[in-house]
Amino acid sequence: MIKHFHFNKLSSGKKNNVPSPAKGVIQIKKSASQLTKGGAGHVPEYFVGIGTPISFYG
């Protein structure tokens, strides 16, 4: 039960701490290389991915 509580608090704190944007920026920076390789066609796809990086990266 203590572990569960800790996990819940960590999840809540992490979401409140705004780690998602930071992760998104890292992914965008990493994707920048792939974006250049992929071309402009991938730009809109990556833009949509920014909103849902987890879903996009699968």
Swiss-Prot record:
Outcome, altering T52G: No change of RNAP inhibition but increase in permeation into bacterial cells and bacterial growth inhibition
Cross-link Isoglutamyl glycine isopeptide (Gly-Glu) residue location(s): G38-E45
Propeptide residues per the UniProt entry: 1-37
Record-marked site positions (Essential for permeation into bacteria and for RNAP inhibition): Y46
Domain of life: Bacteria
Consequence the record notes for mutating Y46 to A/C/D/E/F/G/H/I/K/L/M/N/P/Q/R/S/T/V/W/Y: Loss of RNAP inhibition
Signal sequence annotation: none
GO cellular component, one term: extracellular region
Induction comment from the UniProt entry of this chain: At the onset of stationary growth phase.
Biological process, per Gene Ontology: defense response to bacterium; killing of cells of another organism
UniProt-annotated site: Essential for permeation into bacteria, residues: G41, P44, F47, F56, Y57
Annotated phenotype, changing T52 to A/F/H/L: Increase in bacterial growth inhibition
Effect of F47 to A/C/D/E/F/G/H/K/L/N/P/Q/T/V/Y: Loss of RNAP inhibition and loss of bacterial growth inhibition
Localization per record: Secreted
Keyword annotations: Antibiotic, Antimicrobial, Bacteriocin, Isopeptide bond, Plasmid, Secreted
Function: Peptide antibiotic that functions through inhibition of the bacterial DNA-dependent RNA polymerase (RNAP). Inhibits transcription by binding deep within RNAP secondary channel, where it sterically blocks the folding of the trigger loop, which is essential for efficient catalysis. In addition, it also seems to restrict access of nucleotide substrates to the catalytic center, and shows a partially competitive mode of inhibition with them. Exhibits potent bacteriocidal activity against a range of Enterobacteriaceae, including several pathogenic E.coli, Salmonella and Shigella strains.
Full protein name: Microcin J25
Source organism: Escherichia coli
Gene expressing this chain: mcjA
